[in-house]
């Protein structure tokens, strides 16, 4: 076994400390692989991956010594820099009661069914028990009736969704290639560099109001690990295929509204709306609408990738957290002018089937989201890090939970990954065991015959909101059978 001198303690970045203690999980579904070769291929691939990225064998632990004298709650990754043997970071199981075909084609599940899938397939619980080791990453390969499910749980202290996607890219290459390329980015140097990017920008006004300690709450009998199970009876999980062509139509319509109305929030104008702005605005509109005006607590949380918002841009292949939740006000009623323009646009284009009032509400929510995202600039990010640096206690810090949350994995190229002969390409990608109200835009599937791939949305919704959501004309207009 390696000696003590090879033990490493890598301090997490300030942005890492702004995320809660969760273990999200990617579930990659493969139909009918060569089951006898899967175990050997994955084990050999992990051995190569560990040699390239030894920190993935580690645990997240509190820092000690001189570092802790400067601030409380500082965390680091403890691992062996040069392991002599691969650690058991993958386990193999069988469950012939499950089917890739059934799970991947299911359009809706109860919360209990979804949590059961997470408990069966995930190597780590979503909400870890503080008394147990907090692992950087763990894998589980489960053989089911018609294929294999490869699940990767990762600590949100160490990876954001984009970073975990890049790790999976490296893993696929290690499984496929006899001699994979080394990681061309020094992850530890970048992680430490984030402590020093604030420069002279100072602290963003009101930033402490956006980031605060988690409130105390009553834990269920099973502790933190049982939180998803406690929430499960009160929720529904929906999976929708959303027509890319119709999202494009609504995006163009909303941008026509924008050009006619010149949406402003304070002193700042919104110049354009993206397809993702429109889709998240639409799902927010479908979720809850109060004809009397803004719903109390109706803010919209959107996860924003910060890598390309710094100047110069942060390396795309960075594993660590470079994301932040943008909190946008939502669900305000459209103005009379907005309704009038929406009525005109709907009347002029027979392809627009939703009601003009729904289009106007969608437009307002999309503009609110775009305006909020556009405020996350280079100066804002550096100021955010400056504020984190000023905190004497970093544990735990997190953003408050808005009325509805969205995160997008559409940019992840997980469907393009080739795991080689034993597994091949991924047939389906999901996640399980999350909590409402959350919309996840899943990775973009391969396009068929040159057409734009449909949007793939996983939606965690409370049971009380589910009937109203399913009745919404906007949603019926967009979904693909």
UniProtKB/Swiss-Prot annotation:
Annotated Gene3D superfamilies: Chloramphenicol acetyltransferase-like domain
Which InterPro entries does the entry mention? CAT-like_dom_sf, Plant_Fungal_Acyltransferase
List the molecular function annotations (GO) for this entry: acyltransferase activity, transferring groups other than amino-acyl groups
Give the record's pathway.
Secondary metabolite biosynthesis; terpenoid biosynthesis
Which controlled-vocabulary keywords does the entry list? Acyltransferase, Transferase
| Entry protein name | O-acetyltransferase andG
Source domain of life is: Eukaryota
